[in-house]
Amino acid sequence: KTLVTGGTGLVGTALSSDIKISSKDADLRDWLEVENVFDQYNPTHVIHTAGTVGGLGANMNYKGKFFFDNIMINTNVIEACRIYNVEKLVCFLSTCVFPDNVEYPLTEKKIHLGEPHNSNYPYAYAKRMAGVQIQAYREQYGLNYVSVIPTNIYGPNDNFSIDNGHVIPSLIHKCYLAKQNNTEFEVWGSGKPLREFIYSKDIAKITNWILKNYTDPEPIILS
């Protein structure tokens, strides 16, 4: 029986599973609510995608919230998986866990070689700590828990907010409004950075494979 957290999010909606929960079903920052979820469903497998997320604007404006929410959500879910004897956990991290000044190409071994970018460091450190917790639990308890690091994801059910959304949906929304209102199409930044994206339904296919086959201690980049 597979439980997906963040079931109404970008990745969660693309995944197929027995049970999907969202923030409407439980506040995963609250340990008692997390216990209730695991008591009710008693999952054997968990795909953990839940978190407080957003684009550049949200990361800059809600640093404290992003850190607290994600630290609590990740810590509670991973600990509940241990207590309730979950056989396999796939925990989603983020490419922002990588250092800002790091030599390319990125590999899984480079996560802790420097500080993350200052635009979203609270979120990035919270995600890094989820990976550390997974590794610590593997080493102490011998659990088959793994971390995955997807590149920038896009697809149905994304956040199309211009101020707080991700790059592709925000640009789509901006372009739509510019066309509707016959105004200029404004794009933030210099246009020089290279960005990599992956479709949410491709993430779902890879995640299903990882759930069944991947057991290595190192996080795996999905790109």
How would you describe each model-predicted region?
Residues 102, 141, 153-170, 180-184, ...:
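Glycine/proline-rich active-site loop of Rossmann-fold NAD(P)-dependent oxidoreductases
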Residues 27, 97-99, 122, 146-170, ...:
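Flexible, glycine-rich beta-alpha linker
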Residues 76, 118-151, 167-181:
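Active-site Tyr-X1-5-Lys
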Residues 56, 91-107, 122-128, 140, ...:
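Conserved catalytic-site region of short-chain dehydrogenase/reductase
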Residues 1-17:
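N-terminal Rossmann NAD(P)H-binding glycine-rich loop of SDR-like oxidoreductase domains
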